[in-house]
């Protein structure tokens, strides 16, 4: 009888973190087992039917650049695509897509089932096998033991999950799925630092009962239609659908206020803290009491269903209040609710107990990714899952870990924030969290990370060939623009005014002309000489290459300045702190700082500097102590390094 029970990596959970973790590990050649309580829910979008957004779209592009599945699955399932902040600078532009839930799950499952080195098995996990301080496997509900050299735990909201609808509550991982109570209890036995968080979801509405004629239509972008993945294309997209906009009103707000005495949030039944940037409708009405109306987006759940997701009214109010508040809004007077909204509480574990690899500090080989680390959102989960899967594989291969820095990726910002600052509420990514966001754009995610992904072994041949072609095309076009000159002798003043806004008084390289505020790559390519010959073009046709060339030239000064800033910080950012470092012995440190550093054990000086309460003066004292102590990397530092810190 042949049934494999020994693997290199076990991934527990088949959500966005688990699927990316399993795919990454398997792409890198490790035998990988993905355990899920239900194979039918692999890649399920548990809340809103959308991928991307401000900060989140950047993470999706980074996962894609490393060979991940989320972006290409969205291209195959996306029923509306938009570029947010399109009128603003490239650093904050972000792709957002509405996705057909069924098509998205199909796209993810297809990749899982066709990925070499990856096995799927349907069983919930009740226990982890731990020998000494190392995890060695997992035990399912049926008592089946699987052994592995690394385990990635991506439990989502399932750990001791509890759903609240009004004053009623029951145990669940999400609506329709059982919780992971035994696994939660087992993790508590392992003395991992733990807390409770909560999130919520709105009621779903039957589209046949919605009067769209009185709502505002919100179509997707059409010129051009955005594409998420470097491997994607518009031809992959299914039929496109609009969203619709309505608003709450004073009657809605009165109904909500009248139901607060039966709200689990406002009666103390819910202990967990909810997401600040995705508040429930009752929280909005309470916190923004002076606001007369809130915008609500009706988002289609898919092409083959009438179900709509009313984005903006997440709630745990009793069902009768939910029905009344929905029907109080314009266009929803006769709305039929298909599923009630609810809040869910769940266990999470303090991410300050993790290394930058997402491996736990106390149990070797055990990695955490997704909501278990206190984050919220599909995109944040997928990025963490990929990182955990990569590092689990690297550990087994006895290779150096990969931990992106804050100046390299939004994923680096995400993980650094989690492991140095922890969370008091579900963490959501925004572009404002990244101090080097001009260098961490959506458009250059592949230029930043695909080379790294190839070296790690998680970027395939087809994607690599596409990337090399693009990189070479960008380099060639930049060189052409820098070496092609235009002078007043061959450029008529009228033509210069048409393209450049004014005439030129001397010879200019095309690259310098493109840097002018009102000149675009497209208009520059149309520049003609006095004899009618092309002076600017024909240029390149590939939109991604044109975009990269234009941004690199127009923002060169700012990007170079940011690169110099990164270089200044590099002298201490990546200095590894000794594992045995005794913070209590550092003279001049406050007791609070000593205790925090001793508890969190930061891996680098840069991480230490971002722990709450650790001041620049404290970092300087640590540097002095380390240099005097003769610690290898610090003894060779130049004089006055501590002053620069």
UniProtKB/Swiss-Prot annotation:
Cofactor section: FAD
GO BP of this protein: tRNA methylation; tRNA wobble uridine modification
Disulfide bond is among the record's keywords: no
SMART domains: GIDA_assoc_3 (SM01228)
Chief location: cytoplasm
Amino-acid positions noted as binding NAD(+) in the UniProt annotation, renumbered to this chain: 274-288
Highest taxon in the source lineage: Bacteria
Keywords, comma-separated and alphabetical: Cytoplasm, FAD, Flavoprotein, NAD, tRNA processing
Molecular functions per Gene Ontology: flavin adenine dinucleotide binding
One GO cellular component term: cytosol
Positions with a binding annotation for FAD: 13-18
Matching InterPro entries: FAD/NAD-bd_sf, GIDA_C_N, MnmG, MnmG-rel, MnmG-rel_CS, MnmG_C, MnmG_C_subdom, MnmG_C_subdom_sf
Subcellular location: Cytoplasm
Reported function: NAD-binding protein involved in the addition of a carboxymethylaminomethyl (cmnm) group at the wobble position (U34) of certain tRNAs, forming tRNA-cmnm(5)s(2)U34.
Stated family: Belongs to the MnmG family.
HAMAP family in alphabetical order: MnmG_GidA
Subunit structure: Homodimer. Heterotetramer of two MnmE and two MnmG subunits.
Name this protein carries in UniProt: tRNA uridine 5-carboxymethylaminomethyl modification enzyme MnmG
This protein's encoding gene: mnmG
């Amino acid at each position: 009888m042949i049934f494999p029970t020994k693997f290199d990596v076990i991934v527990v959970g088949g959500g966005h973190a688990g699927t990316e973790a399993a795919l990454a590990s398997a792409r890198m050649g490790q035998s990988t087992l993905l355990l899920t309580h239900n194979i039918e829910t692999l890649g399920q979008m548990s809340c809103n039917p959308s991928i991307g957004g401000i900060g989140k779209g950047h993470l999706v592009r980074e996962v894609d650049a490393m060979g991940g599945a989320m972006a290409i699955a969205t291209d195959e399932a996306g029923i509306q695509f938009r570029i947010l902040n399109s009128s603003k600078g490239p650093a904050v532009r972000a792709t957002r897509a509405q996705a057909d839930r069924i098509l998205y799950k199909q796209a993810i499952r297809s990749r899982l089932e066709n990925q070499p080195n990856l096995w799927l098995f349907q069983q919930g996990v009740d226990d982890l096998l731990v020998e000494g301080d190392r995890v060695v496997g997992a035990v399912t509900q049926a008592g089946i033991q699987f052994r592995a050299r690394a385990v990635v735990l991506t439990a989502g909201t399932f750990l001791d999950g509890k759903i609240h609808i009004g004053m009623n509550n029951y145990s669940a991982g999400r609506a329709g799925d059982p919780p992971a109570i035994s696994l939660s209890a087992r993790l508590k036995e392992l003395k991992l630092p733990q807390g409770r968080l909560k999130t919520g979801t709105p009621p779903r509405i039957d589209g046949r009962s919605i009067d769209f004629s009185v709502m505002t239509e919100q179509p997707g972008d059409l010129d051009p239609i955005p594409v998420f993945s470097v491997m994607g294309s518009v031809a992959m997209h299914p039929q496109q659908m609009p969203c619709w906009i309505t608003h709450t009103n004073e009657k809605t707000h009165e109904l909500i206020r009248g139901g607060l005495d039966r709200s689990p949030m406002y009666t103390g039944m819910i202990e967990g803290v909810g997401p600040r940037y995705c508040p429930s409708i009752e929280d909005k009405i309470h916190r923004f009491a002076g606001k007369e109306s809130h915008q609500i987006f009706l988002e289609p759940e898919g092409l083959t269903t009438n179900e709509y997701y009313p984005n903006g009214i997440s709630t745990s109010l009793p069902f009768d209040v939910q029905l009344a508040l929905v029907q109080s809004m314009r266009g929803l007077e006769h709305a039929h609710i298909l599923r009630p909204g609810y809040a869910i509480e769940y266990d999470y574990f303090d991410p300050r107990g993790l290394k930058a690899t997402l491996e736990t500090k106390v149990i070797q080989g055990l990695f955490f990714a997704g909501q278990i680390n206190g984050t919220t959102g599909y995109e944040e989960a997928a990025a963490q899952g990929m990182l955990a899967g990569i590092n689990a594989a690297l550990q087994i291969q006895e290779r150096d870990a990969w931990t992106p820095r804050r100046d390299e990726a939004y994923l680096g910002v995400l993980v650094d924030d989690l492991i140095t600052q922890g969370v008091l509420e579900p963490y959501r990514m925004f572009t404002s969290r990244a101090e080097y966001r001009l260098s961490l754009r959506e458009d250059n995610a592949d230029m930043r990370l695909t080379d790294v992904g190839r070296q790690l072994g998680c970027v395939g041949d087809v994607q690599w060939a596409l990337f090399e072609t693009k990189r070479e095309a960008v380099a060639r076009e930049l060189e052409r623009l820098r070496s092609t000159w235009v002078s007043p002798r061959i450029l008529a003043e009228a033509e210069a005014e048409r393209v450049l806004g004014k005439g030129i008084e001397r010879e200019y390289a095309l690259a310098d002309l493109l840097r002018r505020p009102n000149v675009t790559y497209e208009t520059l390519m149309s520049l003609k000489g006095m004899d009618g010959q092309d002076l600017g073009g024909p240029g390149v046709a590939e939109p991604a290459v044109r975009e990269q060339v234009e941004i690199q030239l127009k923002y060169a000064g700012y990007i170079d300045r940011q690169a110099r800033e990164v270089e200044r910080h590099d002298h201490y950012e990546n200095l590894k702190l000794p594992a045995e470092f005794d913070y209590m012995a550092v003279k001049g440190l406050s007791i609070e700082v000593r205790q925090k550093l001793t508890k969190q054990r930061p891996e680098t000086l840069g991480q230490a500097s971002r722990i709450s309460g650790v001041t620049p003066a404290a970092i300087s004292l640590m540097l002095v102590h380390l240099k005097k102590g003769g610690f290898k990397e610090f003894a060779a530092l130049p004089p006055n390094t501590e002053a620069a810190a």
